[in-house]
Structures are given as structure tokens and as C-alpha cells.
């Protein structure tokens, strides 16, 4: 069957009250859908994207050669089967792919927010999505699925909207961002802030799309290191040297160096640096226990079936961080959860690239 890819943007004029006490109004949310919603709306699956992801999770636009970021996972006969499920993925507020973010025009001034944009949290991102679903007359969904920052959103849904989803599937994530991950984000943030072409946030976005931003590229290289693992780097690159470079050339490169350069500099031409600063801030301050006496108290609110998936060699969100959630659920007597640690050498990116290692688990969770 057809993927039935549709893209929409909803405009909201009511204020969005943020966790910080700030207000965002008006605001837009861009989202994409796949499959067909059944009559009683019982087949809705929400997919939440990661830091640099977007609402475009699957399929191809007419002018595209590269499909959505989870195309191998969403579609006819795939783990999230669009022959069965109606899938919705929205771009989070604070991002740069259609939903309101720091480079959106501030009402009524018609100038980009830039630093006037309020800090948003993962909880705020989820709240905005919940408002979107109310607009769409969707008040309960079959499941919410997300990896990395998407997993953070899924877990926030479980705690703050406990009656919204039958099932929550969280992959490669954590209950609170730890110093190791915050440190990688700090390198990226400082690299952006100290690039003179960033112009203290008053850069020309069109110029950056052409030229990129070298500071952001360096920060992204650091990020890529945290997404991989020692094992995956060794397997992918070894000590291979670029065939066109001389071993004794000062700037001759190993293949791993070339990989980091390509991905780092290419990234800066399609992702906005202010959005990167705001979203990494949201990730850094993420903590499921905020507002509760403990993580256990927060998890007592969960009524959905909870499926936790970690990856053995994940450097960014270590597998024991997910195990801590499972352990707390055990302690409070929650019987409606499962935890698996997937053996993978791909590190954090395994949830994007090594789908065969866990897709059957997700299928079983959705269909069970």
C-alpha cells in the first residue's frame, strides 16, 4: 500500500505556557502523517524525533533523493506498519523545520526572535504536541515511539499525560541527561558561540546555508564521536588513509577524519545554529524527576505499558541509565514494563542504523 505521506502546519493563537514561566504566542507546529487513521482513531502511533531530526520521518518528497530519517522503520510491512497504523511525527518547538523556533518571526514585530526566543524544555515540546493532538481531535493513541531526544519526549508523555498512550516505546535515551552528554553539548555550544561568523546570533541565515558555519561544524564533529563507538569506528574506518592524500602531508587525512569533516560541514548548511543551542539546552536540563520528590515518584504516574530499549555500546546515553528506569519501576511494583539491552557495536546511532537488531521487539510491542 501507499505510504500516504502528508505534511501540514497548524497555527495556534492561544498562549503556550512554558515550564520556565515564559509564554510563547502565537506558534506553529509542522507535522507529517503516514497511513490512514481508522474510524475510531485507535490505530494512531506518534513518532518523536531526536535533536537534529524533523517531522519528515519517512518517505521522499518529490525533490528529494534522501528519505526521512526513520524510513527503514516506518512504512508498509515495516516495524511501524503503515498498513495498520496511522503515524504522526511533528517537528518540536525550538527547531528549524517549520515549527516555531528562534529564527521564526516574532509577533507583532516581524523580526526573528533570535535570543528573544524563550528557553523551551522537553516537557514544553510534549505539551505543544499534546495541544496539536487536541486540535486534531486525537485524545488517546495506540503508542508513542522515540529514540534519543525522541525517547525523552516519549517518557515525558508517559509521566505528564499518563492516559494518552496505551504503549510507550523509548529507545537509546535516559531519565536525566548526565554530565558526559552535557559535556559534548558544551563543546558544540562553545564552538558555535565563538565563531565570528555566528555574529553573536545576528547572522544571515541565507548566507550560512551557502557557506556553513565552521564553529558549528567542529561542534558537530564532537557530537558524531558520541553517536558512534570505539567498535563501530574501528570496523567502519580502521586506520585507512585517504588514497588521494600523502601519509607525510601535514593535512593528509585518515578516513575517520574525512568522515567527521564531511558530516560536520555539511550539517551546518541545513541546520540552524540558534536552534541547535536551544535544543541542546532543552536536552541538558531534561530530568524526569523535576517537580517530583524522586524518579520513583515521577514513575508512579505511568499507566502505559512501557518498553525500554538501550544499546550496549551507546556512549551518549549509557545502557545503565535505561536500566535505572527499569529498576525504579520494579521497586514501585510496576509490572507493565520491559527492558532489553540490545547488543550492538554501532553505539548511540544504532537506533537509526541497525534496525534489524530491535525491529521485531518494536513490532511485538505494537502488535501485542
Swiss-Prot record:
Subunit (UniProt): Homodimer.
GO biological process: homoserine metabolic process; methionine biosynthetic process
GO MF assignments: homoserine O-acetyltransferase activity
Record's subcellular location: Cytoplasm
Domain of life: Bacteria
The keyword Acyltransferase appears for this protein: yes
Residues where substrate binds: 220, 349
Gene designation: metXA
S-S bridge residues: none
Any Pfam family the entry gives: Abhydrolase_1
EC class (word): transferase
Listed EC numbers: 2.3.1.31
Active site positions, chain numbering: 148 (nucleophile), 314, 348
Lineage: Bacteria, Pseudomonadati, Campylobacterota, Epsilonproteobacteria, Campylobacterales
Biological source species: Sulfurimonas autotrophica (strain ATCC BAA-671 / DSM 16294 / JCM 11897 / OK10)
Any one Gene Ontology cellular component term annotated for this protein: cytoplasm
Protein name: Homoserine O-acetyltransferase
Amino acid at each position: 500500500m501507499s505510504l500516504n505521506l502528508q505534511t501540514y502546519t497548524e497555527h495556534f493563537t492561544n498562549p503556550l505556557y512554558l515550564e520556565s514561566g515564559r509564554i510563547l504566542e502565537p506558534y506553529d507546529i509542522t507535522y507529517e502523517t503516514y497511513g490512514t487513521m481508522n474510524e475510531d482513531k485507535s490505530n494512531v502511533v506518534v513518532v518523536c524525533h531526536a535533536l537534529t531530526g524533523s517531522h519528515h520521518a519517512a518517505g521522499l518528497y518529490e525533490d528529494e533523493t534522501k528519505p526521512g530519517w526513520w524510513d527503514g522503520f516506518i512504512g508498509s510491512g515495516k516495524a511501524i506498519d503503515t498498513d495498520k497504523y496511522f503515524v504522526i511525527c511533528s517537528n518540536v518547538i525550538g527547531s528549524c523545520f517549520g515549527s516555531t523556533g528562534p529564527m521564526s518571526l516574532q509577533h507583532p514585530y516581524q523580526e526573528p526572535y533570535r535570543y528573544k526566543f524563550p528557553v523551551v524544555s522537553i516537557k514544553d515540546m510534549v505539551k505543544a504536541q499534546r495541544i496539536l493532538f487536541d486540535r486534531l481531535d486525537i485524545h488517546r493513541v495506540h503508542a508513542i515511539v522515540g529514540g534519543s531526544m525522541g525517547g525523552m519526549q516519549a517518557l515525558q508523555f508517559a509521566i505528564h499525560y499518563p492516559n494518552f498512550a496505551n504503549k510507550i516505546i523509548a529507545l537509546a535515551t535516559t531519565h536525566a541527561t548526565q554530565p558526559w552528554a552535557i559535556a559534548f553539548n558544551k563543546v558544540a555550544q562553545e564552538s558555535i558561540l565563538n565563531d565570528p561568523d555566528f555574529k553573536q546570533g545576528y547572522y544571515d541565515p541565507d548566507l550560512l546555508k551557502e557557506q556553513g558555519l565552521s564553529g558549528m561544524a567542529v561542534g558537530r564533529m564532537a557530537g558524531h564521536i558520541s553517536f558512534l563507538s570505539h567498535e563501530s569506528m574501528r570496523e567502519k574506518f580502521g586506520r585507512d588513509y585517504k588514497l588521494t592524500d600523502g601519509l607525510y602531508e601535514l593535512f593528509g587525512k585518515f578516513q575517520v577524519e574525512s568522515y567527521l569533516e564531511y558530516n560536520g560541514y555539511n550539517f551546518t548548511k541545513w541546520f540552524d545554529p540558534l536552534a541547535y543551542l536551544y535544543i541542546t539546552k532543552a536536552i541538558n536540563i531534561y530530568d524526569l524527576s523535576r517537580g517530583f520528590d524522586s524518579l520513583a515518584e515521577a514513575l508512579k504516574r505511568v499507566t502505559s505499558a512501557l518498553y525500554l530499549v538501550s544499546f550496549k555500546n551507546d556512549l551518549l546515553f549509557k545502557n545503565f541509565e535505561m536500566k535505572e528506569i527499569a529498576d525504579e519501576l520494579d521497586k514501585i511494583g510496576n509490572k507493565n514494563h520491559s527492558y532489553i539491552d540490545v547488543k550492538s557495536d554501532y553505539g548511540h546511532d544504532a537506533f537509526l542504523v541497525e534496525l534489524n537488531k530491535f525491529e521485531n521487539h518494536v513490532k511485538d510491542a505494537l502488535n501485542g
